[in-house]
Amino acid sequence: MFQRRLLHTIKYAKQPQLYLHESITFTKVSFSKDPNKIHIGEVPSSSDLSKVNIEPSKFMENSKFKDILHKTIAKNIYDDQSYVIEAINYRGSFMPIGDEKVIQEYMNQRPELPNTMGFVHVDNDGIMEKGTYEVNDTYTLCNVDGIIKLPETMLEHLLKAL
């Protein structure tokens, strides 16, 4: 006779946009409540899912997720009102597109490079130029500042893409 282990899903207490999906060998970290959707990455399993702590040293990124993330940003960034407004401050340069692991203390403060998902070119009138999103290869989903957190509008687009 064999034992059957019930697998379950909970919200991650330290980042409420995320869900933890229990598995036999690892815990999937996801923006989706559905454990079958593409996950952000994974951490080793724990006997108590509520005690899982996502740390950079234990977190394994899912490259498929990163591809979807960047495609979603590249497609939707130009119509996201929060970025449209912010672009005015980056006339004639590249605007960093940061996640929200760290909330910036003042206007025009650039996110640290590991928290910058990519860059968009802004013209001299303060308008993002479509098709100019460039991926930041040094971006990490999970680092000493925490795990990825997205603006709500971008999260909605991402959930549709997953």
Whereabouts are the PLM-identified features?
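N-terminal interaction modules that seed assembly of large macromolecular complexes
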Residues: 20-73
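N-terminal mitochondrial targeting presequence
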Residues: 1-32
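Mature, matrix/stroma-exposed regions of nuclear-encoded mitochondrial and chloroplast proteins
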Residues: 58-162
